[in-house]
């Protein structure tokens, strides 16, 4: 074997290996550079997304603070409003619920009465048979929008033998600043005069007040046919109607006549057109025809002919 020739071949092999090694390392560097670039790009994208999320979160928080926590304040209302409430009813209820009511305020100095009012009363047991004998202890009236128009505790003339606090919410302490029955009668009569009265079994409330009201001006939710269906044709409870048709949870503990009056008005407003259709069946509109012509108020009476004397 030629040693010189072998040495020459060996050198060529080494040069070839060096070229291949250099080429391989160059490819590795390029691949590594691409991977590094990809990782950097991904990191930049992630950081951009995080920045956007963070800025959006801060913006929402600042908006919530500017509105004074409106979202949290309105959340309970969203839970209470249900499937069958109209948009108008929801918006009006949200607005009136936010307004504070003053217990035993008497006639509100700010609320406008309007054409429609809803009334509810709370009773206490009196006399030797308090389960059957009741007396008026509180009266509440709201307008069409659910704003409190009148609220007053009433001093019964009879001796109270059962406060019914767990139901009525009335206790002896409330009588300290209660108004007399005569004063409340006068106040309520002035409010109801010439207006449409909405109530639930409202005849009981009027009897307790010893007041009357024209039947054509009464809308009673306990007598509304679509609402009576839920009670199998009988008189439905206000609590059931409020839950089923308004999604409102009322009368869980002691009753509030203000709350009940508001629920009653909402029930009327929810189905107002049907209420008025039913009402027209009993009390059709009277059409007055003006028969006055040429200034004559009455028809000329025909003179009777006197029989001739023979």
Curated annotation (Swiss-Prot):
Query: Annotated Gene Ontology MF terms?
Result: 3'-5' exonuclease activity; exonuclease activity; nucleic acid binding
Which domain of life, per UniProt?
Answer: Eukaryota
Q: Where is the Exonuclease domain?
A: 115-277
Location of the region described as Disordered in the Swiss-Prot/TrEMBL record = 1-107, 287-310
Has keyword Hydrolase? Answer: yes
Cross-referenced Gene3D superfamilies:
Ribonuclease H-like superfamily/Ribonuclease H (3.30.420.10)
Q: Fetch the InterPro entries from UniProt.
A: Exonuclease_RNaseT/DNA_pol3, REX4_DEDDh_dom, REXO1/3/4-like, RNaseH-like_sf, RNaseH_sf
Name the keywords, alphabetized: Exonuclease, Hydrolase, Nuclease, Nucleus, rRNA processing
Residue ranges under compositional bias (Polar residues)? 1-11, 83-93
Per the record, the major location class is nucleus
A Gene Ontology biological process in which this protein takes part is: RNA processing
Family (UniProt) = Belongs to the REXO4 family.
What protein am I looking at?
Answer: RNA exonuclease 4
Taxonomic lineage per UniProt? Eukaryota, Fungi, Dikarya, Ascomycota, Pezizomycotina
